[in-house]
Structures are given as C-alpha cells and as structure tokens.
C-alpha cells in the first residue's frame, strides 16, 4: 500500500511550518462502488457520518464527493452554552463558541499538499440561522423554538474519504499529529489499512425506508402568510427596511431514515451543494443551489441568488420564463439589493479595493425553479479567517433582507418561530484554513419522529402576497417530492 507523503517527507513538512497535523493518504480504485454504497458502509460502524457532493449547472457531477465517519470531537452550542464531546469526555463551557472553534482549528492546522483535494479534514456540520446572535450580540432573537436544533453543530473529522469522480479513485486521508511524528505515522499506516479493509469488505448498514405518517402541515396557512406579508410591507413603507425574506415551515410525522430521500434528491435535483448528515441532532438532507461563502487560498466568493420563476415544460417555455424574469423590475430590484448586500458583507473582511462583481444577473436553472444569479469576489484580509467570513455573511441577505439586522428583527417578530438550520450554513472549515458553505435551503431535517421542510420568499414594496405564498410552495416542491418518492420504495 503506497502512502504519501512518506515519513521522511512528513518530517521535512513539520520542520518547515507550525502545523498541528499533516494529512497522509492512499488510493483505491472506485470503479465498482458509489458514494452511496460507501456511506452505507460507514453508517454501519458510526452514528456520526456525512456525505458532501456537488453537481455543476449543466448537471455534470463535481469532481469530488467527501465522506467522513467516527469524528474525534463534536462541538455543539445552544443559547450560549458550548459542549465539546469526544468518545471519552464531555464538557460544557459558557465561553465564546467562536474562540473554542478557533482553538480547535489552530491545534489542527494543516499544510495544503499538492495532489490532494480541497478538503482533507476539518470541521463539518452547520451554523444555524440564529448563529447571528453570536456575531451580533446586540440582536435579540427570542422566537419560540419548536424544532430543538443546535445553534452550532460541528464535528471534527481527522479521517476523510474523497471520492474522485473523474479518476474513479477513492482517496483515503488520515491526519496525523506532528508531535511524536514517527510513532503517529506508523499508527496511521495501520489505520489507513483498516480503512481500506472496511471499504473493501465492510458490511452495509441495514436499509431503513422513509415513511411519512401524516401529511405536511404548514406553520402558516395562505391567509396567515399573506397577512404576514402585509405587515412586512408596512415596515417597508415606513422605511425600516427595503426587503425582508419571510419563510414558512412544513412539518410531518415520520419514521425511518432520510437517506432514501437524499438518494432521490441527488438524482432529480442535482445541485452545487448536496449533503447528507446523520448525528446527535438528527438527520439532514438537501440540495442547495446557493453558496453562503467560499474561502479558498485567500479568495472569498459569495453567489447571491434572487428572483425566481418555475421551470417551463419545454425549452421554449424556459426561454420565455427567463426573459420574463430578467425583465421583471421587482425581481431585478430585489436582486440588486442583495448583490449590494453581498458586496457589503464581503467587504467587511476583504482587503480594500478587492471586492468586485465577477458575474452579474445570469440565469441559473434547477429542477423545479430558475433564479437570477450573480458572483461577488474579494481577497480576505491577513488578520481575518474562515470564521470571520461566516460571521460577516451569515445569514445571507437572500435569507434575511436589507438592511440585514433590522430585517432579522422583523423576521423574529413576524414568524415568531426559530428557524434553526434553515437559512443557516452547511459545509466545512478545513484544517488548511479554507471554507466552503452553502445556504441551508432546499433541505429536510428530521428529529424525534418529525421531519421539517422550510422555504421563503423575498418581500419588497410591490410584492403580491398570494404570489409570494406560491413561491414558497414552489421552492419546497423538490424536497417534498423527494420525500414522497422515497416512500414508494427503493431497492436497498
């Protein structure tokens, strides 16, 4: 079994930089397996697993799928209390969760090695919509919490399985501590061999179907949602805000697993961010079209999506709807506000003069809807890091409104129900300092026998309440249909 880098190369890397860990790796052929099969093997041996995948706008599969299991640590935070849990210990701290996350990342700082994918280990999980109360402590968010998810749930994975979809290879990655390097390297050789044996010969977890025991019930019926829109428009007329995003939640009783729903989503709604999580906070599946923020080698990107139409039944119908969407002054105005907000958010942590709009108002097509999309870029300041990027941008303007803080206050008042994972950030912070997170939309999450789906619509001065209610329904369609189809039965 060939392992790179060698022990001698690791010694040189450790001597050249102040690294806490170094990733070593080996490869297997993957032409007779799939990411879903690997996931089921991992679910057999660990209750904490993830799968991150990607598909481009033209439905080509992204190069890498990332899988992980058996985390070293789990960091959770709820209402200011942070718990750090390992296999043997658990402690709760009232200190700043961001400081705790930074300490963990500093202890595990890693070099970026040539030939390895963008993610080789780090923290994987979510920051909820309500995480803004930690980055903006003067903001009061006191809505009811009926779902019971954490404000932050991040798991530290030192083992990563990267599925190279182009080369049809599995890259098995293990991060080793740089203290006692020789001992740790030889221990890691044995662990990589164990990972190899698990993937080649491991049993798959039992297939557990998904079953909805009740129909979905909305948090707000059409009349209640339209009334909420009218109240929001009053705030707009009074000058409090220019725009606000109001969401609606669907809830049903469920038994079984969401894995089959994810299998449906990844084939019927391929998206830039597709994810499956299973952990102490339940299951999360989704196919999000929208980046919250990406940081790679010092360059920041965010991709505002705002302005929506349903997909047409034919290519000609699509083209007509695209033209209609781009000509709609209400949609263009909403999009421009959110591009400006994205520039402002990126600008908080970027070097002066580096913020620019790279792509402006292009049409992005997805399975059930189309959006207007733009790309905002900046170069991060030397004194800022990945967590600063999350602080600056979460929640995205496309899920809150403008001005952002006042919009969040109005959402708290009108919805009066904690959003939890919806509208937050899902993804990873790498040991190398890189970050890739999507906005937590087009997702379902389950806990304690219930499954939740949320969607929202952007409200501006001339919004038609009934139309905004229908937009919410359209945005939830792909996830609802995936859950319905998963019930029809899938081969194990």
Predicted segments, located by residue:
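Extended alpha-helical targeting/anchoring segments
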Residues: 1-492
